[in-house]
């Protein structure tokens, strides 16, 4: 498959995740790719709680629906929940700089403990997450925004079903799966990928 602007395959996403140091950061990008975003300002991702993750049945509960986890997504999710130290960067002396996370937080996404965020137990805010995603995509070598990352995940699921999609097929599949995105845009990206 050729690379289409504004799209990454699952393989390309995994290659990008290797460049990230923190399981929490990998989880953020994987969650968006798997449509854990929300209607307004990534609210589903921001408010995702540890109790919403069901490792026994391999899914994440998001509102009224369940997001299945493959082995890789499940591994990253488990590592993100268990992560205790957040690495900012490794300096020139190969000393890792960062901070301890507050694992008493009920949220999967935890912030740097400060008084303004209840010592790291309050949920991340939208602006903070949006800026983080922008930086993570750049570090991972993915030239995407949140919408493009989410759309890439949708397209990846569709291409696993079949490769020859018509606009009507796309519209029907999106409607059946209750996904509200521009069908023609999805169709043109699939057409571009298939050459």
Spans of features found by a protein language model:
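Basic, Lys/Arg- and aromatic-enriched nucleic-acid-binding interface segment
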Residues: 10-40
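Short, flexible/disordered intra-domain loops and linkers
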Residues: 114-124, 162-168
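Alpha-helix N-cap/helix-initiation sites
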Residues: 21, 39-42, 126, 143-151
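Basic, alpha-helical nucleic-acid-contacting "clamp/cap" segments
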Residues: 61-113
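Short, basic interhelical loop/turn and adjoining N-cap
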Residues: 49-54, 125, 176-185
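Short, basic (Lys/Arg/His-rich) helix/loop patches that form interaction surfaces
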Residues: 130-195
């Amino acid at each position: 498959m050729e690379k289409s602007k504004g799209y990454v395959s699952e393989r390309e996403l995994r290659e990008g995740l290797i460049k990230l140091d923190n399981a929490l950061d990998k989880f953020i990008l994987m969650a968006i790719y798997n449509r854990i975003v929300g209607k307004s300002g990534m609210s589903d991702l921001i408010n995702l709680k540890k109790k919403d993750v069901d490792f026994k049945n391999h899914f994440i509960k998001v509102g009224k629906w369940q997001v299945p986890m493959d082995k890789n997504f499940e591994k990253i999710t488990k590592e993100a929940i268990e992560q205790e130290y957040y690495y900012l960067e490794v300096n020139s002396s190969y000393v890792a700089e960062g901070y301890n996370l507050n694992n008493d937080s009920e949220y999967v996404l935890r912030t740097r403990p400060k008084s303004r965020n209840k010592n790291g137990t309050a949920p991340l805010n939208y602006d903070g997450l949006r800026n983080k995603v922008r930086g993570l995509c750049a570090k991972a070598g993915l030239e995407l925004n949140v919408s493009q990352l989410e759309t890439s995940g949708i397209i990846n699921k569709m291409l696993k079903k079949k490769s020859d999609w018509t606009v009507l097929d796309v519209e029907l599949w999106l409607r059946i799966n209750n996904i509200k995105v521009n069908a023609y845009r999805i169709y043109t990206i699939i057409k571009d990928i298939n050459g």
